[in-house]
């Protein structure tokens, strides 16, 4: 639209507009623009050096953090082994505790049964003692009766004589004597019962003493079981404390991993290294040219970061996941930066193509209207257009790096002699550009890993 408006304005105007002074002013403006570009290039070199230093510091921090993560992983493995051993011991203690509880229940049942038998025996003993007292009282009464019988008067002599005579004439005298002795030797049933009860009492007393001894031993075993149970409960409490400590250590390891992934990964490497002042809108012409120069640099092949020390090699799956996430984020960030550079180049290309069309149309109109101008002026204008097109094609070819072709002042022939300041300024511009390009190449050779991650 602007080109059409300008063409319409030039069609409406009939007076000549082309002047060599305007051309010289444009060249001087271009020289000033180149000087500003050089200043900006120095600033970019300083920022790039700062980025190199920050990247080296971040690499050292990452190596230190990887060592810490490895140490934490080893500690976690040791704690896991300790926890496994504690779990095994806890299971064994639980099994022994269950066995002891079962034994204590059985012993309590035995104690109850023994107490019941003791009570029964005590009742039997009381009953037998009462019977013994009754028998004693009855025996005492019989003894009194015998004493009374002995106190009776003796039989008369005549009666004794008769008895003696009868005994002499008795045929079965020995049998009678045996019967008398057997009757005297036979005990009464009360006495037999008394002796039987005495024997039972002695047996019961012996059983009672045995039961008391058993009761004392069972009580001692019960106390030992209670002590072991309390010790097992204390050990279980210690295992709970160990488990809580294990959970705390696992939480600390997870926090360290999150801090490692959030604070010092290579995911946001390009965003941290490249300042935000470089990515501004395209309205500023010098900034757009600088971005074109910066993005047209040769893109080095991506290589993952290699660590030389074997101690920092992460053998577990967590380290592999971190490396994979890091590579994916680097690839995504490189694609985003490349897309941004492509969009900037496309915008520069469109604006340059529009300006080129306008310039060619104006040149054609000037050639048609100003036939009186010399052939040299026309030739200089064509050479300028060729040089500008060459510069744009070199800026678009970003794979081989941005290397502007120096415009020799001898090739530009004008009707009037060009000022020497213009020539010196352009020579200074191109020499500085070559020098900065060489310095950038040297820095890339010094830091190949940084160049691989910065793009």
From Swiss-Prot:
Keyword hit for Iron-sulfur: no
Family label: Belongs to the CDR2 family.
Residues modified as Phosphoserine: 310
Record keywords, A-Z: Coiled coil, Phosphoprotein
Organism this protein belongs to: Mus musculus (Mouse)
Coiled-coil residue spans: 37-141, 191-264
Gene Ontology CC annotations of this record: cytoplasm
Free-text tissue specificity from the UniProt record: Expressed in brain and testis (at protein level). Expressed in the cerebellum, cerebral cortex, heart, lung, spleen, ovary, kidney and testis.
Protein name: Cerebellar degeneration-related protein 2
Region (Disordered): 132-152, 395-419
Compositional bias (Low complexity): 403-419
Sequence ranges of Polar residues compositional bias: 132-142
Entry annotated with the keyword Cell inner membrane: no
InterPro entries for this protein: CDR2
